[in-house]
Amino acid sequence: MIKLIVLDVDGCLTDGKIIYSSDGIESKNFSVKDGLGISTWIKMGNQVAIITGRNSTIVQKRADELGIQHLFQGIKDKYRVLKELAESLSLKSYEIGAIGDDLNDYNMLNLVGRSFTPNDGNKEIKSIVDTVLSANGGDGAVREMIDTLVDENDQRDTFM
């Protein structure tokens, strides 16, 4: 049973686009569907981690808003961070699911028990994951992953 899901941000929780205003203010679009899925997953007693290569106050705000317990930003070696997190939580790799969309997620996705990529993920990533989702990044892909895991964990009644 999956107890922890690990999320990449750009290209998974968002569509991968970063918008800068003329004042240099960064913005990202997050899916409300993903957010509801994440908050419900947490309420069910499961855990969520974000491991992302960039640093962003917007991501910190979204993680706080959703109650995400583990946030790692500016990470170059996602595999190492996930391995350390799993050890600190006493989780085995088969108890972890993850979503990633590009080559910097490759090693992390090979570490987990259930791996996913959005429909618009990189072709190399599509070739190694367990499931290529029908939704694109930022457009409900994380929610689709959570729905899949809820069904596989036989937790649909709890999720509702």
Where are these regions (language model features)?
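Mg2+-dependent phosphoryl-transfer enzymes with acidic/Ser/Thr/Gly-rich catalytic loops
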Residues: 27, 79-160
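Alpha-helical substrate-recognition element adjacent to the catalytic core
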Residues: 1-77, 160
